[in-house]
UniProtKB/Swiss-Prot annotation:
Chain segment of the transit peptide: 1-52
Protein's name according to its UniProt entry: (R)-limonene synthase 1, chloroplastic
Sites where the protein binds Mn(2+) 3: D488
Paired cysteines (S-S): none
GO terms for MF: (R)-limonene synthase activity; magnesium ion binding
Source organism of this protein record: Citrus sinensis (Sweet orange)
Sequence positions that bind Mn(2+) 1: D343, D347
Length: 607
């Protein structure tokens, strides 16, 4: 293993930026988030040569190193951990006491949406297996669209084959689906996102429910109940449950579940404790990663690039939120932070000659070549990447006696080469056709790299056959990465075109077909929905070499892309929606009511 060099010790002539005041409250955050990137030219001098470069004028991170180091949570205390373990035992007993199929399905749905399902996987598997094996006994869901849809969604989610024909009884040959019950319509809408290619009934279900949910949003009045119906309809239309990362749903659903009259107090208390305990873990991880970032000197020396450490951590938390994946989150966060810097070099700052040399340096993986040929600012970036990848490979070798250095180097090189293709398109003012753009874009969006990193850092033991499958660019990686690419383009293309970047999928489709931007955007959205049907089929394939954990890493990456780019560029520009979610997920614990705190004095007193 090559020795590591500290990039922070290398000199560079890039000027640093003056940081904005630290934002620690929502009001200050909203003011800072209004700044948008614009294009301008800056002149820099390297090796006595002055080079005119583009600059995106990205704003500094909302949360700096000192703020992250100041984080402190009470939920690391052993008292909370003991209470959580006690509650888990009681919930397991309560699960056994639930015997009616619909009640069992609703309990599973609540466990999933509260972020608790991973604690009760054996119990959930047993219930779903039993329901699937006795599906001919369907009186409990007969003429109940809500129950039928819930069963369909949960069984398909967990890999059980269910025919779309279960919905035939809710259709009329002439008018289609018949239902005016909001609960049933919402449940059917969520189920429709688990459809497969060629399922006409499920496609009709999506069209029917989308139309009615939009109407419910428009016709709702100011009554509290109607306002909540409109909110649920809006959330389902924006982002269905199947497209949401677990932790993102949990924070909202805990708040909703607390207001329900039928809530289970054990579940609610456990969900709050679980959320706050995980948040405390995340804060400690952020402190450590922020220290790493500061030590590299990249944020200080490469002032043209984005410091998006907290956003990078949000990605990693969304991909692998469970506590046992701490190392996976660390590797993913650092990788995404480095990807962000390299992306800015290729998209904005580097000259084409420099980019070709950097690509060659990554291909050679030769430190002497890099130090000899790269300009100063690129040496910083290459050394940070080189050191980190080698340390990652060494850790896995030490822990598992598995040499994955070639695999991870190859994955990084694929990304860098895709970046270079887009840089050449930009410099030659070339607009590719949509399919040509997507074939390169599914790599440049980082999908194959992030999936490979997730697997190598989150799997023990690493299975050679599974790794080789991921490296072969299988269809599931292909289509997942294309969805990621398209969602990114929907959220970022306006800002990036304003900067003069390479055309994105929307512009490629407009150029190719003559369509308006509005039509192009609707086409891209429909493409994503159809691609999800392909992904659904691959994840349900019993013969797939992917483990359930690896498949969830992959799905959660796509889900996080939907969140990050739903309201714009949540990663690069730090839009308000992403900032608010980041604040509540990472820095704002859920208050426990006084009665919930009764266990502090005597953990065994609360039932």
């Amino acid at each position: 293993m090559s020795s590591c060099i500290n990039p922070s010790t290398l000199a560079t002539s890039v000027n640093g930026f003056k940081c904005l005041p630290l934002a620690t409250n929502r009001a200050a955050i909203r003011i800072m988030a209004k700044n948008k990137p614009v294009q301008c030219l800056v002149s820099t001098k390297y090796d006595n040569l002055t080079v005119d470069r583009r600059s995106a004028n990205y704003q500094p991170s909302i949360w700096d190193h000192d703020f992250l180091q100041s984080l402190n949570s009470n939920y690391t205390d052993e008292t909370y951990k003991r209470r959580a373990e006690e509650l888990k035992g009681k919930v397991k007993t309560a699960i056994k006491d639930v015997t009616e199929p619909l009640d069992q399905l609703e309990l599973i749905d609540n466990l999933q949406r509260l972020g608790l399902a991973y604690h009760f996987e054996p119990e959930i598997r047993n219930i779903l297996r039993n329901i699937h094996n006795h599906n001919k006994d369907y009186n409990w869901r007969k003429e109940n669209l809500y129950a039928t849809s819930l069963e369909f969604r949960l069984l398909r989610q967990h890999g059980y084959p269910v025919s779309q024909e279960v919905f035939s009884g809710f259709k009329d040959d002439k008018v289609g689906f018949i239902c005016d019950d909001f609960k049933g319509i919402l449940s059917l809408h969520e189920a429709s996102y688990y459809s497969l290619e060629g399922e006409s009934i499920m496609e009709e279900a999506w069209q029917f429910t989308s139309k009615h949910l939009k109407e419910m949003m428009i016709t709702s009045n100011s009554k509290e109940e109607d306002v909540f119906v409109a909110e649920q309809a809006k959330r389902a239309l924006e982002l269905p449950l199947h497209w949401k990362a677990p932790m993102l749903e949990a924070r909202w659903f805990i708040h909703v579940y607390e207001k329900r009259e039928d809530k289970n107090h054990l579940l609610l208390e456990l969900a709050k404790l679980e959320f706050n305990t995980l948040q405390a873990i995340y804060q400690e991880e952020l402190k450590d990663i922020s220290g790493w970032w500061k030590d590299t000197g990249l944020g200080e020396k490469l002032s043209f690039a984005r410091n998006r450490l907290v956003a990078s951590f949000l990605w990693s938390m969304g991909i692998a939120f469970e506590p046992q994946f701490a190392y996976c989150r660390r590797v993913l966060t650092i990788s995404i932070a480095l990807i962000t810097v390299i992306d800015d070099i290729y998209d904005v700052y580097g000259t084409l000659d420099e980019l070709e040399i950097f690509t060659d340096a990554v291909a050679r993986w030769d430190i002497n070549y890099a130090l000899k040929h790269l300009p100063g600012y690129m040496k910083m970036c290459f050394l940070a990447l080189y050191n980190f990848v080698n340390e990652f490979a060494y850790y896995v070798l030490k822990q598992q006696d598995f040499d994955m250095l070639l695999s991870i180097k190859h994955a990084w090189l694929g990304l860098i080469q895709a970046y270079l293709v887009e840089a050449k398109w930009y410099h030659s003012k070339y607009t590719p056709k949509l399919e040509e753009y997507l074939e390169n874009g599914l790599v440049s969006i980082t999908g194959p790299l992030i999936i490979t990193i997730s697997y190598l850092s989150g799997t023990n033991p690493i299975i050679k056959k599974e790794l080789e499958f991921l490296e072969s660019n299988p269809d599931i990686v292909h289509w997942s990465s294309k969805i990621f690419r398209l969602q990114d383009d929907l959220g970022t293309s306006s800002d990036e075109i304003q900067r003069g970047d390479v055309p994105k999928s929307i512009q490629c489709y407009m150029h190719e077909t003559g369509a308006s931007e509005e039509v192009a955007r609707e086409h891209i959205k429909d493409m994503m929905r159809q691609m999800w049907k392909k992904v659904n089929a691959y994840t349900a394939d019993k013969d797939s070499p992917l483990t359930r954990t690896t498949a969830e890493f992959l799905l959660n990456l796509v889900r996080m892309s939907h969140f990050m780019y739903l309201h714009g560029d949540g990663h690069g520009v730090q839009n308000q929606e992403t900032i608010d979610v980041g604040f509540t997920l990472l820095f704002q614990p859920i208050p426990l009511e006084d009665k919930d705190m009764a266990f502090t004095a005597s953990p065994g007193t609360k039932g």
